[in-house]
A protein has these predicted regions:
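Chalcogenol-based redox active-site neighborhoods
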Residues: 1-131
C-alpha cells in the first residue's frame, strides 16, 4: 500500500480515485492507515464478503485474507483492468498509471515485490496487537 500512497497524487491527477479494502477490523485498519499515512479510503470487509465476491479470498493465510489485487473500474462500473497477484508479485502504480491516463490500451507488467523492513514490522505489530 505504501507504493500506492506514494503515487496517490498522480492517481488523482489522472482523474481516478483509490480505495483499498482490508479484512482487518476497523480499529486495526485505522491504525494501519495512520502508520502508513494513507491519504485514501481504507474500507473494512471483516466478514470477507467483498473479497470472496471479487475472487481474491485466500483462506490459507491468517484465517482468510485478501490476495493482493488491483481493479480499475470505470465510472459506469465496467471493469477496465484487473490483476490478482501473489504476495511476492504485484502490479506497481507506475504500471497502472498509463491505464488511468489513456484509453486503456496499456497493460501493466508485474514486478517482484519485497516489502520494506518497516512494512514487515507494522504487519507483525498489527497481527499481535489487540483491536
Amino acid at each position: 500500500m505504501a507504493e500506492y500512497r506514494d503515487a496517490y497524487s498522480q492517481i488523482r491527477a489522472a482523474g481516478a480515485e483509490l480505495v483499498a479494502i482490508s479484512v482487518d477490523a476497523p480499529a486495526q485498519s485505522a491504525r494501519l492507515r495512520r502508520q502508513l499515512g494513507l491519504p485514501f479510503t481504507l474500507l473494512c470487509d471483516t466478514d470477507r464478503r467483498v473479497v470472496r465476491e471479487w475472487h481474491v479470498y485466500n483462506p490459507r493465510e491468517h484465517g482468510g485474507i485478501a490476495r493482493p489485487a488491483v481493479f480499475v473500474v470505470e465510472t459506469d462500473l465496467r471493469l477496465r483492468f484487473s490483476s490478482v497477484d501473489r504476495v511476492a508479485t504485484r502490479v506497481m502504480p507506475a504500471d497502472v498509471l498509463p491505464i488511468l491516463q489513456d484509453a486503456g490500451t496499456s497493460q501493466p507488467r508485474k514486478h517482484a515485490y519485497m516489502p520494506r523492513l518497516g512494512d514487515f514490522a507494522r504487519a507483525i505489530g498489527n497481527l499481535v496487537s489487540p483491536g
